[in-house]
Amino acid sequence: MKTSNFTLLILLFFQVFRLTAQEKDILIGGEQLKYRIHLGFINAAEANIRSSSNLGSIRQIPTRKIEIEGKTLGIFNVFSPLLDVWVSHIDPSTLLPVKAEMNKREGRYRKQEVVDFYHDKGIAQISSPQNSPKDKNLAISNSMLDLISGYYFLRKKNLQDLEIGQKMSAKILVDGQVYEIWCVVKGFEKVESKFGTKNCIRTSLVLPKNNLFQDKDAIRLWISQDNYQIPFKMEVNLKIGFLSIDLEDYKIAGKTIYTALP
């Protein structure tokens, strides 16, 4: 399995924050989530997401910095090491990205990219030393998202109002390409975990046609049915095997939100 696929799955996992959420301040400062990723029975990778405690400012726009880090572990880190860092600076008032940064280290492959979003002008300025040309402008809609801001936008929706069969979508800009991702509500289930039994909403993610996943219902995702509404568990049928992503830890401002069973 290519290491870059781990990062794709990690970011898709976090996309659902944007697809399911309460009507409240969802850009929580000091939020930290840790996930463990298994390929079959192998502990393959981990992912961490962190939000800054304080607001910053870019072009005089208040922003919250969100960072996602994905890295391989164990045998995967020996033969196919990955350390990817994705950063988004999001305007809390609109939940749109102001600036996005990417730093990929996958084996010998390296790529850095910075995207500045000018939604009022309908332009994204993309800069990468690995691109040719290095700098380019891309026409975008006034509501275009990046991968991480896609993590929040529809989180404004109240999970309790969702119905089985309901569909939600988000359009995101990745590597100079625009993709549309759909989230379909499949049902409500209890999920067993290290934190005990958790009530969750089960969804499926539908992606553009690709060679990575086995079928249309290949990505199944469970979202916690509580005040936090976070991605809790994910299962993926890949063409080369079975992958699972499980919540390992969740904190806000250093305080543990979910306590593991003894």
Language-model segments: residues:
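Alpha-helical structural elements
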Residues: L9-L12, G30, D146-I148
